[in-house]
A protein has these predicted regions:
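Mixed-charge, glycine-accented linear interaction segment located at domain edges/termini
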Residues: 141-220
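Structured, beta-strand-rich domain cores
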Residues: 64-140
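Broad hydrophobic/π-residue packing in well-ordered secondary structure
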Residues: 35, 90-91, 160
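Intrinsically disordered, low-complexity N-terminal regions enriched in serine/proline/glycine
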Residues: 24-26, 33, 113, 178, ...
Length: 220
């Protein structure tokens, strides 16, 4: 006899929240490789947005003859109190002399990783987390508001809307966004990924390709 469905078991009341462990990976457009990662402090929000994937119905013989779906794209936005110095060039800012900045310059792509928490009713926020990786991100122009200081001062935040360029994945369609769920993978495999992304005693932080990430978790 099949078991009766049961809702809201304590260990199954799962939810997600938070964002931390931001890392920025500069991209060398000449070599096509990502450079050593640097910490991105002050993350307030990362919003993941889907784009594309829309129906394009083709009609013939008075019926829908074919339904061609456009390519899905990944877009995102980042809000933060601050950002790494290396981000300036990606945001269209040049520094011709130390401390002197020029806007409206060419924008450069970068890689980005961040972590979101997974909680449940038993372990609260210690249940697990997801490590997200974004390739080929390029910021689009956004507003920067400068407000007067008043009797309820608040620190300003910076925001960036990101377009992405997908990268190859063997056996799958190209992607710009990938994530790993700590509750579903072996701890040793997760540690190997984090050693790459965050650095270790012997290696600097680096940004792997999707295939290199998959190789860490491939079942023998």
């Amino acid at each position: 006899m099949s078991p009766v469905l049961e809702w809201d078991k304590a260990e199954e009341r799962i939810f997600e929240l938070g964002v931390d462990r931001g890392v920025f990976y500069p991209y060398d457009q000449q070599t096509g490789e990502y450079l050593e990662g640097v910490v991105w402090n002050g993350l307030v929000n990362v919003t993941e947005k889907g784009a594309g994937g829309e129906d394009n119905k083709q009609y013939a013989d008075n019926i829908v003859y074919a339904n061609i779906r456009s390519e899905a794209e990944f877009e995102a936005s980042i809000e933060a109190f601050t950002y790494p110095d290396e981000m300036s060039e990606c945001d269209g800012t040049s520094q011709p002399e130390v401390g002197v900045f020029i806007g409206q310059q060419l924008r450069k792509p970068f890689g980005f990783s961040y972590r979101t928490k997974i909680g449940n009713n038993n372990d609260n926020l210690d249940f697990g987390y997801k490590v997200h990786m974004v390739w080929g991100a390029t910021p689009e122009p956004t507003e920067k508001s400068r407000d007067t200081i008043n009797d309820s001062p608040e620190a300003s935040t910076f925001t960036w809307d990101l377009a992405t360029e997908k990268v190859p994945v063997t056996g799958r369609k190209p992607t710009a966004h990938m994530w790993v769920d700590s509750t579903k993978v072996a701890p040793a495999e997760l540690e190997a990924l984090e050693d790459l992304l965050y650095g270790s005693d012997s290696e600097s932080a680096s940004f792997p390709t999707p295939d290199e990430v998959l190789a860490l978790f491939t079942t023998p």
